[in-house]
From Swiss-Prot:
GO terms for molecular function: G protein-coupled receptor activity. This is G-protein coupled receptor A5. The lineage of its organism: Viruses, Duplodnaviria, Heunggongvirae, Peploviricota, Herviviricetes. Belongs to the G-protein coupled receptor 1 family. Its main location: host cell. The chain crosses the membrane at residues 21-41, 51-71, 82-102, 123-143, 174-194, 209-229, 250-270. Residues 42-50, 103-122, 195-208, 271-302 are cytoplasmic. It comes from Alcelaphine herpesvirus 1 (strain C500) (AlHV-1).
Amino acid sequence: MADSSNSSLNCTAIHDQTVLILGQVFNSVWLFISVIFLYIFACKLCFRPRIYLWLSFYTLGFMLWVLCKVLQEYVTGKFKCVITNCIGDFCLVFLSCIMLGIMLDRYLKIQGTLRGGMKDIHIGIFVSASCFGSLMIALLDGLHMGDSEKLQFNGTESFKCLPATSVSSYKAQLMFKSIFCIICIIMCLILTCLTAKKVLGTRLRKKYVIVGNVGLLSFVNILLWVMIACGLLKQALESNLSLCPTKQSTYIYPYTMPVTVIFVLVIYLFSSTHMKNAMRKSGQIRHSLSSPNQVQSSFRLV
């Protein structure tokens, strides 16, 4: 059965119309909240400081992911499953790259390599490269999913698309995504430690507050990657791995994961303001850094 068509899968029906309707209501709420965030970042804050430009791209990627889940429920067509599955893969890689970009920008500001951190053009290049790389990875995954028609699930479940046409392909997908998340965790830890070391090497009176904020932001992102990696690894290592939809993949993951993304956005809004105030209240800043460029970079830490 492992490599058979979905038509021969003997899956337990898990469709729940009430849960499905509630899920779509929540998806509408997430999209509405995302629009509010975009309005705040663009119209109220004018993308300044530049952290809000980063978060705008992050919000757009999140909105695409939510729309992908909605489309998977209601759109029909031969290539629907391939397209929506690829969009999901694209969003995972793209959103992770944006978070790593934020951490890299933060480190460059402290390091003083780029005066004031990345400029708008640098951010645009990074986002464009991330978008292109994410698209290539999604397309490669799409080529290994199998026959597009066999990805259509012929049942009453809410889960309208299979992840692949064979268990071996599905396991490879799970392993790749797990390894990708682990790599993101490692890179996040490296950038966080380098940033914290640089801040602690100064004589800022509020340096421990700043490091605490940096650590909090990194912890939230690492926690999200750990949750994804552990869930995917658990599935990949199952001896009886099946293509059949589960309650976790159908309801729990799609409808609860947006909560963590909204939480990340709120944390960044709060911590950015808190960190900026801590920098401004540090009276010894001009004596703690070695150059005017680093002074300016520190005030623009967020």
